[in-house]
């Protein structure tokens, strides 16, 4: 109630101030415009207030509207509206339920297998099942791929071996060397009669050439943009982007992780140099869930529902048990902020260690508090971030969180070998998450994401080893040294942090 009163008081002061300043302006046009702006700002402020957002985000938007009323109003229409609880994604939510009915048998949690887990591990996977309805598989093999060279070598080989269908879903696709290689393989497979479907994000891949798309279409590839933006008409859902990176081949082989399709992911960009990223190669039952995630997104964009047995039939269910694997999709089409809640559960259930790798580290208050409490409780909390920016505002906003984390005992490291783009969480060396979700508010609240949650698989052991190896190529940030950094860095970081609820 106190927060709401503060917001209402802010709106009252803002409205009064803007109205009084109108008397100092010259001309009735300017006066009328000021009244219009006042009414608009107050109206939008009331709308934001009634949405019951987090107070920090509410006040940030009000500040933007107050300082930059015209630009702030436009930005709010483009990026500020909350559609999670609206009917914007209703069609997609309905298709989810229809799709899950097709694999009901595989949705049931394997109680016998779950009993082998520890208590807090059981709670995590049950929570994931409740939030996302996705099953856990104990008949899936996974392999960690640690850079672009290894990842694209596996992807190209798997694509060439396809016999029935290829499904791709990517945030960024570039018409460069690796993009051309992937295109040529897809065109060849389509000409062989393989059904190829390609879903790319309309904003992330806005530079993708028309000739690239046309070549694929002429070869028989079905390629569709996700939520395309057609200037000058900007859709109000422009801020909700498909950040997923999924490949499914013949329903039995899948890929998921942090790498998009572009030469920079192979370390060919001179600014970034070596690109440290992580992808997951998947074979077996859990591929069905990746398939389902793709088919739901495809149905949402095209209206074409492809829930056939040839796509959703059991995939290599006789594979040797290699621990539990659970594919989880999250996004604004879900009732809950799934990835955030699962990350929070992982952090709060940790007994020994929490190791996080994230290129964009902008936690909300819940995650930030959980990390500090864990460190203060004696848990080994380590966070690995890049030491060079690709998004400068995000980079400096991220650094503003370091002092309070360091003071609580969290160890923060900056990766120095190249650019770090992996999105990993490892808890107690037993449970891990690998996928597309960053530890930031955009991934929590706005983007469509997908993550693989792993329990006691060989891949968890690999991720632990990779994290230890990556630490050899870092500089550890020390609290005393960092808090004595130049004042202008502190001002810059604090300013960027003010915008963090909007990033």
From Swiss-Prot:
Source species of the chain: Halalkalibacterium halodurans (strain ATCC BAA-125 / DSM 18197 / FERM 7344 / JCM 9153 / C-125) (Bacillus halodurans)
Annotated NCBIfam families: bac_cardiolipin
Protein name: Cardiolipin synthase
Gene label: cls
Family, similarity comment: Belongs to the phospholipase D family. Cardiolipin synthase subfamily.
HAMAP family with a match to the protein in the record: Cardiolipin_synth_Cls (MF_01916)
Record-linked CDD domains: PLDc_CLS_1, PLDc_CLS_2
Function of the molecule: Catalyzes the reversible phosphatidyl group transfer from one phosphatidylglycerol molecule to another to form cardiolipin (CL) (diphosphatidylglycerol) and glycerol.
Segments crossing the lipid bilayer: 5-25, 29-49, 59-79
EC number: 2.7.8.-
């Amino acid at each position: 109630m106190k927060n709401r009163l503060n917001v209402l008081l802010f709106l009252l002061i803002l409205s009064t101030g803007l109205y009084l300043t109108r008397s100092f302006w010259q001309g009735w046009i300017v006066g009328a415009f000021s009244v219009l702006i006042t009414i608009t700002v107050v109206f939008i402020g009331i709308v934001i207030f009634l949405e019951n957002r987090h107070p920090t985000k509410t006040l940030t938007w009000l500040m933007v509207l107050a300082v930059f009323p015209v630009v702030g109003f436009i930005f709010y229409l483009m990026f500020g509206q909350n559609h999670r609880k609206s009917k914007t994604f209703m069609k997609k939510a309905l298709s989810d339920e229809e799709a899950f009915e097709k694999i009901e048998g595989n949705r049931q949690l394997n109680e016998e297998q779950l009993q082998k887990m520890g208590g807090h591990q059981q709670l995590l996977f049950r929570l994931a099942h409740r939030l996302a309805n996705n099953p856990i598989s104990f008949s899936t093999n996974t392999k960690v791929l640690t850079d672009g060279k290894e990842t694209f070598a596996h992807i190209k080989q798997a694509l060439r071996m396809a016999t029935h269908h290829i499904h791709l879903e990517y945030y960024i696709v570039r018409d460069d060397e690796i993009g051309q290689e992937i295109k040529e393989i897809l065109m060849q497979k389509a000409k062989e009669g393989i059904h190829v479907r390609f879903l790319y994000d309309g904003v992330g891949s806005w530079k993708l050439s028309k000739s690239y798309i046309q070549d694929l279409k002429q070869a028989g590839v079905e390629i569709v943009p996700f939520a395309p933006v057609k200037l000058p008409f900007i859709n109000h859902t422009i801020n909700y982007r498909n950040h997923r990176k999924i490949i499914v081949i013949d329903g039995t082989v899948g890929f998921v992780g942090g790498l998009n399709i572009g030469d920079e992911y192979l370390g060919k960009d001179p600014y970034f140099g070596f690109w440290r990223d992580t992808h997951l190669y998947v074979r077996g039952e859990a591929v069905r869930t990746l398939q389902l995630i793709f088919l739901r997104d495809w149905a949402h964009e095209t209206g074409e529902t492809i829930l056939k047995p040839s796509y959703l039939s059991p995939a290599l269910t006789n594979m040797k048990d290699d621990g539990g694997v659970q594919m989880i999709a999250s996004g604004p089409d879900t009732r809950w902020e799934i990835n955030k809640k699962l990350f929070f559960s992982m952090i709060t259930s940790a007994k020994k260690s929490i190791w996080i790798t994230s290129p964009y580290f902008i936690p909300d208050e819940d995650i930030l508090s959980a990390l500090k409490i864990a460190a203060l409780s004696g848990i080994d909390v380590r966070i690995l971030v890049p030491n060079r920016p690709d998004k400068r505002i995000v980079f400096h906003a991220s650094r503003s969180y370091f002092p309070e984390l360091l003071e609580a005992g969290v160890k923060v490291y900056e990766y120095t070998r190249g650019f770090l783009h992996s999105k990993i969480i490892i808890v107690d060396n037993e449970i891990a998450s690998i996928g597309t979700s960053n530890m930031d508010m955009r991934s929590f609240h706005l983007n469509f994401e997908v993550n693989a949650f792993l329990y006691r698989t060989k891949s968890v052991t690999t991720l632990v080893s990779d994290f230890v190896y990556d630490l050899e190529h870092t500089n550890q940030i020390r609290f005393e040294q960092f808090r004595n950094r130049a004042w202008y860095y502190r001002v810059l970081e604090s300013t960027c942090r003010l915008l963090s609820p909007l990033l």
